[in-house]
Curated annotation (Swiss-Prot):
Cofactor annotation comment: Binds 1 Fe(2+) ion.
Active-site residues, Swiss-Prot/TrEMBL: 134
Function: Removes the formyl group from the N-terminal Met of newly synthesized proteins. Requires at least a dipeptide for an efficient rate of reaction. N-terminal L-methionine is a prerequisite for activity but the enzyme has broad specificity at other positions.
Keyword presence, Secreted: no
Annotated S-S bridges: none
Top-level taxon: Bacteria
GO molecular function: metal ion binding; peptide deformylase activity
Name used for this protein in its record: Peptide deformylase
Gene3D superfamilies: Peptide deformylase (3.90.45.10)
Enzyme kind, highest EC tier: hydrolase
Organism for this UniProt entry: Vibrio campbellii (strain ATCC BAA-1116)
Documented EC number(s): 3.5.1.88
Amino acid sequence: MSVLQVLTFPDDRLRTVAKPVEEVTPEIQKIVDDMIETMYDEEGIGLAATQVDIHKRIVVIDISETRDEPMVLINPEILEKRGEDGIEEGCLSVPGARALVPRAAEVTVKALDRDGKEYTFEADDLLAICVQHELDHLMGKLFVDYLSPLKRKRIQDKLAKIKRFNEKQQNA
């Protein structure tokens, strides 16, 4: 398994709409395994393939406290949304930024697992929010898109400043 590089906002590749997985092959399973390792390495609770510059409809999630219950969602689809919720969200592709985003409180989701078997599940609370957040990535959408232009610009400026600082440190 390999740790993949996570793209950061405002990288245009994060805006790419992911294509469906035609067939779950050993290559797709390796992508899934690498994504799980990357999610754990980055200390995230979810990761969409788009975030690692792979434009396929693949998501991995693990909201367990023990960090050993990864969920694999290939070609995920939200079948139903119910209620309203929202928490302050963060994102591996927008490091250091958090914002309250309105989401459905409960969702019904259909996806394929790592072996290509279709399954359906109900999600609420953090899992429902995480699923919606990650599926947004597959559509080329980020949580900052829900914010006002001013807040989005502030986040972009902050990330640019951090990037310049890191580059200066590397060149020193």
